[in-house]
Amino acid sequence: MKYILALLLLVAAPAIAWELPDAVATPGAINPAVTQANIATTICVSGWTKTIRPPASYTNKLKVSQLAAGAYASPQEPRTFEEDHLVSLEIGGHPTDPRNLWPQEWNGPYGAHAKDRLENFLHRAVCAGRMTLAEAQAAVSSNWIAAYQHYIGPGR
């Protein structure tokens, strides 16, 4: 049984590794303007993220640069990626710090669409008082896939 588990980990690890950002290049960065004390007037206000979201011209340029640098090498076109915030704007991630932005594939079991589900869950939990801002930020920045599996469930 141990051998089967080890084999599964070896086969699955490269796929999961690609879906996680490079921990050195993208450790995540927090927006200092968002704190636990002010979430009611920042992230928990409908439409607040629109006021701080960087323009597509900035994120597209960064995405192309990061893909070209090889940190996120892929045979696919840049249009198949979203330049995503590791710590989402919904939970106080920094909007423009490159340490919080990375090219994430749109599709796949742990693509950008799946991460969006986790971001929405964490945002609702923080704003409802079921989780602190720091807990949500730590969950997603340490390993967003593990957080997804814990909070949303595997294969959902």
Set out the residue ranges of the language-model regions.
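Nuclease and nuclease-like effector domains acting on nucleic acids or nucleotide cofactors
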Residues: 3-81, 90-156
